[in-house]
């Protein structure tokens, strides 16, 4: 990338940026330490720990607005048993949210519901004591599955801020085995069919992520029944017209107090019900050369090149 001489904002003293694809965190750590690169993204906790002692490296830690979630299709044709509302409640109760945060790394949060921590109207985080295996087993029995069931989960080869979705899926599989649900994980490349199936609403059970297009809670309204993401889970507005109506209420609210109230109502409605379980609000870790200034985490585009200067 080369500097635009006609850029309307404040100019930096950097004329060219070279972007390199280095999927391996250890490779990034080594090339940053030796000065071959100046900024590294999507680092693991282990590589961050090693870089912490490097005198020529500075680390920026934070929490993004990107979320990882479990999706259970409401259409029984695709979701099978996970389309059952009581099964969905059981799965919520069975997940080990603190264990998921350990996999994702330092800075990970578990949002209370569908609105990320840090957004207007957010109700904060889901308490760790929400997990209850005995309650989950009872809910599963009430749903007609006292002995559990087998279910397929299709997961893509993507990652969320360096966290492999397959790793999150494996954790979900392990957690659900505690209540008798046997998950068979199949990995499919995004370009090889997963992407189309996800968008078309034909995936039955999956773990996916969602990044915000703009920093406002309205971006999360697409998870409501009838919304863009809601329909990917086979969740139509007709299935829950009261909750679906809150979409427009939130979009049209001009008073902050009224808007906050609608957003809180949405979160409460989706706290224990619905086809989506937000399992993690992703952390972000950026390591950069100490010769740079202005390197920081930005929700919408990870890093803002227009803020970076060489000291």
Language-model segments: residues:
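Immediate post-signal peptide segment of exported/extracytoplasmic ligand-binding proteins
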Residues: 11-15, 85, 133-152
């Amino acid at each position: 990338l080369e500097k635009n001489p006609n850029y309307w904002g404040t100019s930096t003293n950097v004329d060219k940026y070279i972007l390199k694809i280095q999927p391996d965190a250890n490779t990034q750590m080594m090339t940053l330490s030796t000065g071959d690169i100046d900024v590294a993204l999507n680092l693991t906790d282990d590589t961050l720990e090693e870089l912490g002692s490097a005198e020529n490296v500075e680390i920026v830690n934070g929490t993004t607005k990107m979320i990882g979630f479990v999706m259970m299709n409401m259409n029984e044709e695709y979701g099978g048993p996970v389309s059952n509302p009581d099964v969905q409640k059981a799965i919520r109760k069975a997940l080990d949210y603190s264990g998921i945060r350990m996999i994702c790394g330092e800075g990970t949060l578990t949002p209370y519901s569908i609105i990320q921590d840090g957004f207007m109207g957010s109700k904060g985080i889901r308490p760790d004591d929400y997990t209850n295996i005995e309650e989950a087993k009872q809910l599963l029995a009430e749903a007609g599955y006292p002995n559990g069931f087998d279910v397929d989960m299709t997961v893509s080869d993507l990652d969320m801020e360096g966290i492999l979705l397959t790793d999150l899926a494996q954790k979900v599989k392990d957690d659900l085995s505690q209540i008798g649900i046997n998950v068979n994980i199949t990995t499919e490349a995004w370009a090889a069919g997963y992407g189309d199936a996800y968008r078309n609403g034909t995936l039955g059970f999956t773990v996916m992520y969602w990044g915000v297009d703009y920093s406002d809670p309205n971006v999360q309204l697409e998870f409501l029944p009838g919304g863009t993401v809601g329909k990917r889970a086979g969740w139509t507005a007709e299935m829950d017209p009261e909750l679906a109506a809150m979409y427009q209420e939130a979009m049209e609210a001009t008073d902050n107090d009224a808007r906050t109230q609608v957003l809180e109502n949405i979160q409460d409605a989706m706290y224990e019900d619905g086809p989506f379980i937000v399992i993690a609000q992703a952390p972000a870790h950026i390591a950069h050369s100490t010769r740079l200034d202005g390197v920081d985490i930005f929700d919408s585009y990870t890093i803002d090149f227009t803020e970076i200067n060489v000291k």
